[in-house]
Amino acid sequence: MATTADFKNGLVLKNEGKLQQIIEFQHVKPGKGPAFVRTKLKDVVTGKTIDKTWNAGVKVETATVDRRDVTYLYNDGTSFIVMDDKTFEQYELSPDAFGDAGRFLLENMRVQVSFHEGEALFGELPVSVDLRVEHTDPGLQGDRSTGGTKPATLETGAEIQVPLFIETGNVLKVDTRDGSYLSRVNN
């Protein structure tokens, strides 16, 4: 059990018979009336998000979630397949288990997966990953209509905006949280 004071991003709650993860929360203390907490919750099974308001100090049941390092193996078209690094057991995760960051997954990449009662729920990539540019148009020195960026397709198929000096074959450090270019990696 936890109270609303214990809320933090990533905490998994048992709410209305479902496992829901806190994506965002905000403590609000209005001038009149009692304090409350606004939350955005994501159902870990279906991926749907809902907004819920809690009275401050309310006790909430939390789920015991075990985070493990796993290796991403492949995408079979309907799910992501990962393998536990210690037991070598394989698990299936739904296509939205990694959220938008799933587009940066490479085979044999080390990721973290959260488990509840032996079932894989959702995964997290490292904050940044190094990926090779598969294709990008040459950047013209005088082209500033796009603010000094151009689209580039990475080896995973994801497309991001990169500076004009980036060329096909460069290895880039990419932020998996928002898909932004961080830096060019020296080869």
From Swiss-Prot:
Mind telling me which SMART domains this protein's record contains? EFP (SM01185), Elong-fact-P_C (SM00841)
The Gene Ontology biological process terms listed for this entry are: peptide biosynthetic process
An example Gene Ontology cellular component term from the record? cytoplasm
Locations listed in the record: Cytoplasm
The UniProt entry, under SUPFAM superfamilies, shows:
Nucleic acid-binding proteins, Translation proteins SH3-like domain
Mind telling me which CDD domains this protein's record contains?
S1_EF-P_repeat_1 (cd04470), S1_EF-P_repeat_2 (cd05794)
**Pathway annotation from the record:** Protein biosynthesis; polypeptide chain elongation
List the InterPro entries hit by this protein, alphabetically.
Elong-fact-P_C, NA-bd_OB-fold, Rib_uL2_dom2, Transl_elong_fac_P/YeiP, Transl_elong_KOW-like, Transl_elong_P/YeiP_cen, Transl_elong_P/YeiP_CS, Transl_elongation_fac_P
Q: Which GO MF terms does the UniProt record name?
A: translation elongation factor activity
What keywords does the record list, in alphabetical order?
Answer: Cytoplasm, Elongation factor, Protein biosynthesis
Q: Which Pfam families match?
A: EFP, EFP_N, Elong-fact-P_C
- Coarse class of the primary localization is cytoplasm
Give the protein's function.
Involved in peptide bond synthesis. Stimulates efficient translation and peptide-bond synthesis on native or reconstituted 70S ribosomes in vitro. Probably functions indirectly by altering the affinity of the ribosome for aminoacyl-tRNA, thus increasing their reactivity as acceptors for peptidyl transferase.
Q: Kindly give the HAMAP family that the UniProt entry links to this protein.
A: EF_P (MF_00141)
Which family does the entry's similarity section mention?
Answer: Belongs to the elongation factor P family.
Protein known as: Elongation factor P
Q: Which source organism does the UniProt entry give?
A: Corynebacterium glutamicum (strain ATCC 13032 / DSM 20300 / JCM 1318 / BCRC 11384 / CCUG 27702 / LMG 3730 / NBRC 12168 / NCIMB 10025 / NRRL B-2784 / 534)
Source organism phylogeny = Bacteria, Bacillati, Actinomycetota, Actinomycetes, Mycobacteriales
Name the gene behind this protein.
efp
